[in-house]
Amino acid sequence: MPRRRLRVTGRPPASSRIPRGVRTVPWPDYGEIMSITSRRGWRLLGPAFVAAIAYVDPGNVAANLTAGAQFGYLLVWVLVLANLMAVLVQHLSARLGVVTGASLTELLGRRLRPVPRRLFWAQAELIAAATDLAEVIGGAIALHLLFGLPLIWGGLIVGVASTLLLGIQSLRGQRPFQHVVMGLLLIITIGFTAGLFAAPPDWSATAEGLIPRFEGADSVLLGASMLGATVMPHAIYLHSRLSVDHAGADAGASEPTPGESAARRRALLRASRWDVVFALVIAGSVNIAMLLLAAGNLQGVPGTDSIEGAHAAVAAALGPGIGVVFAVGLLVSGLASTAVGCFAGADIMAGLLHLRIPLLARRVITLVPALAILAAGWDPTRALVLSQVALSLGIPFALIPLVRCTADRTLMGEHVNPRWMTILAWAATTAIIALNAALVWLTAVGLA
């Protein structure tokens, strides 16, 4: 049976599946969308900021603090490279959603045969579960640091709070949800950069850290973990869906003329580029700040191989106020990222299995594995780092279809990737797969 080809139209198809409980925004007014470079253009920003929450989740905290505490400034280059890759990847994801009017998972659901489609869904759901695990555990650790709550109770509170956050998306629509998430991203940024301003890093050592190199198997493992925490599979799936919703996928929007449709699409693509750059520059800066904070203040300090130990060391070195701000940043990171991850999981199921479960019901279901880990007494920081390794292994399954779809002229029309962009995307995908292969080999032979 030949693969189905999708024709590009001026309006997202009416069949575009949106997870139940998700409200879309109206198709933007023509005058508004053409004013992206004016004062009103900021209103078109937002989807990338929601996706960027995935880049500053508790898994990043565990991976980046561990890397800085163990290897100092050695792996700065990994974060810089990973964030450059993230800008390219999220741009492609947004581009796909704007041009086709469908998310990546929906396109794969149409193109894949039943068995490959179910297998793809299974691995995507496992990756989403690993993501949720990291986010709930991170929030629980933050509540323990702030109030001394047992981890299991902290996990329950994070689950309830993230459910309320999802309620904003379900009841008020995407734009209010985006505004809330952008505010949370600001709090996260303050929480994880305050310590850096209090104790600036060694900038000459930071510059040396930009030279690509590893030192032993453990640094490769951490490099893969940092890459998995930075280039997030569920963020790739989610951003294409958010772009569809933001462009106005609801059936009640007015039908544009062909000329307006082309102009709107070009303006939306221009807006999405700025959206991605702004959001990921912020997220990337936060990631690098985490590593520099650990490299400058935690290297060689006993007990910093856990988030709790790192927090104690930061508070001891920079004062209890910085410690509280750090813990608040971690808590908000967990709350925001678990809600965003649940939304991404709903799109995965809707696009690949054509099943739609209410977001609130899905939140309850996905909370169970994280609570089980907390109740079992496993080392939470180790669970966070391993979850990021799992995310790294899932990246190729999201990247390869994304690059293939955005390089398909039949699907993308005049907005197909330029040749240089496709080459860069394939180079990034190849590098990630090679690093993953090294990680699997090191784990198999017991070196990692």
Please annotate each region the language model reported:
Residues 115-117, 152-155, 278, 321-323, ...:
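Loop-to-transmembrane helix boundary motifs in multi-pass membrane proteins
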Residues 86-99, 243-247, 251-261, 281-309:
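Extracellular/periplasmic helix-exit of transmembrane alpha-helices
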Residues 121-125, 146-168, 187-191, 356-372, ...:
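Transmembrane alpha-helical segments of multi-pass small-molecule transport proteins
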Residues 39, 66-91, 105, 109, ...:
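Extracellular loop-to-transmembrane helix junctions
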Residues 63-68, 91-116, 168, 172-173, ...:
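Flexible loop linkers connecting adjacent transmembrane helices
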Residues 185-211, 220-241, 402-410, 435-447:
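Hydrophobic alpha-helical segments and their helix-loop junctions in multi-pass secondary transporters
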Residues 157-158, 169-196, 214, 390-391, ...:
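Membrane-interface loop-to-helix entry segments
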